[in-house]
């Protein structure tokens, strides 16, 4: 894990969902644990704290995060108290890595209160290292550069030991540039959002929407018809009825990059343990590489490249496109519709209902030809069912 010199499992534990599954994950050999104070309002940290035996603490690498955008941690003392609250919930005297959660601008990278708090916490031996995570900018709130700008600024800052960011086979170039810069500066890397959304279900849902579409949506759908036909050919070619093989391939793609420290996987059940742990130490083979390439060519238009933000900068309605499609990713790829809907409600008036009658300024600027309006309107339709 970069300059930390820690030896971490290539498959790490993202948000755990139950003590029994999490204990089985640890028993399988995983020693990297990722959480945050905001995950399930701190209950996720409590779950971890209740699951870990004190005798195994030294072999584990635990990271948690503080969110500076909630308004609850606005001073050095606030951040120190947040860290101490995390330690209490995690039932540990220290965490190996304390991170700034969701850095939203280049300016945030140098946040004085965060760094002062980390210096104090390190001196008190309550944290060992500091890090930063980034999903992309909140361009609609603060024009703070791209996700790559933020990550590169963190590398240049020199105080961050580990970075946590999206990297996947759909749009690897940015991630690989950041990974190489991290390697050159001896910074560890944690990877998130490595697998695509469940496009098979999306594909069937969109195909069957028919008369439920508005006039503009129907026109947009007709423009996508050739792409949808190509998507159908992909599923028929591989006889695919679910995303299992694609998920495996997506993780193998990351594991094949030996400059990546760990991938954070969400183990929801014992079947996930069997699948993800079985991938540890393996790399991508040619047939699977071809599968991923065909998927990118045939179905890349149904997958937003989270963090790109180019489209958001061109939205006349100042819609948080990247954020909405990140919530959509949580719902589609991680099957977390209830929590994703709650996050969507938290956006207030910044909802994707305005996209129904828009001319598609976002899509015209998207370098990946993503069906942004189609995804946004589907996200709004889906999340509004539970609002």
Locations of regions flagged by a protein language model:
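Structured C-terminal cap/extension of enzyme domains
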Residues: 1, 23, 31, 159, ...
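N-terminal binding-site loop/beta-alpha segment at the start of enzyme catalytic domains
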Residues: 1-60, 93, 123, 153-158
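Hydrophobic faces of well-ordered beta-strands that scaffold small-molecule active sites
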Residues: 9-13, 33-35, 60-64, 95-100, ...
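Residues that line or immediately flank small-molecule/substrate-binding pockets and catalytic motifs
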Residues: 15, 37-40, 99-102, 134, ...
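Structural motif corresponding to the early beta-alpha repeats
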Residues: 39, 54-77, 101-104
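Short gly/pro/ser/thr-enriched loop/turn and capping motifs at secondary-structure boundaries
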Residues: 40-41, 138, 169-172, 196-200
């Amino acid at each position: 894990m970069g300059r930390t010199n820690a030896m971490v499992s290539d498959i790490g534990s993202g948000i755990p969902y139950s003590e029994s599954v999490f204990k089985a994950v640890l028993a399988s050999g995983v020693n990297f644990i990722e959480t945050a104070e905001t995950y399930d309002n701190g209950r996720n940290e409590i779950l971890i704290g209740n699951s870990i035996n004190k005798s195994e603490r030294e072999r584990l690498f635990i990271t948690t995060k503080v969110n500076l955008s909630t308004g609850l941690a606005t001073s050095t003392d606030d951040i120190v108290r947040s860290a101490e609250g995390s330690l209490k919930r995690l039932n540990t005297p220290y965490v190996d890595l304390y991170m700034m959660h969701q850095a939203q601008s280049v300016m945030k990278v140098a946040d004085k209160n965060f760094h002062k708090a980390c210096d104090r916490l390190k001196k008190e031996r309550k944290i060992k290292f500091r890090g930063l995570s980034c999903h992309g900018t909140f361009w609609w709130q603060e024009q703070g550069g791209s996700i790559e700008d933020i990550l590169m600024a963190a590398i240049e800052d020199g105080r961050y030991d580990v970075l946590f960011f999206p990297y996947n086979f759909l749009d690897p170039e940015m991630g690989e540039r950041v990974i190489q810069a991290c390697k050159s500066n001896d910074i560890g890397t944690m990877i998130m959002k490595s697998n695509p959304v469940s496009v098979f279900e999306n594909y069937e849902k969109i195909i069957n929407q028919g008369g439920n579409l508005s006039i503009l949506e129907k026109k947009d759908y007709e423009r996508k018809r050739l792409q949808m036909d190509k998507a159908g050919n992909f599923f028929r070619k591989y006889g695919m009825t679910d995303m299992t093989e694609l998920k495996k391939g997506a993780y193998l793609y990351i594991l094949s990059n030996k400059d990546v420290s760990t991938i954070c996987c969400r183990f929801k059940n014992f079947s996930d343990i069997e699948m993800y742990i079985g991938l540890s130490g393996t790399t991508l083979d040619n047939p699977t590489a071809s599968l991923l390439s065909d998927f990118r060519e045939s179905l890349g238009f149904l997958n937003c490249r989270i963090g790109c933000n180019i489209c958001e900068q061109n939205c006349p309605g100042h819609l948080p496109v990247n954020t909405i499609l990140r919530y959509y990713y949580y719902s589609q790829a991680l099957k977390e519709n209830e929590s994703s809907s709650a996050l969507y409600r938290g956006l207030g008036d910044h909802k994707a209902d305005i996209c129904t009658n828009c001319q598609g300024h976002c899509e015209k600027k998207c370098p990946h030809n993503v069906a942004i309006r189609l995804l946004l309107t589907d996200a709004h339709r889906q999340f509004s069912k539970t609002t």
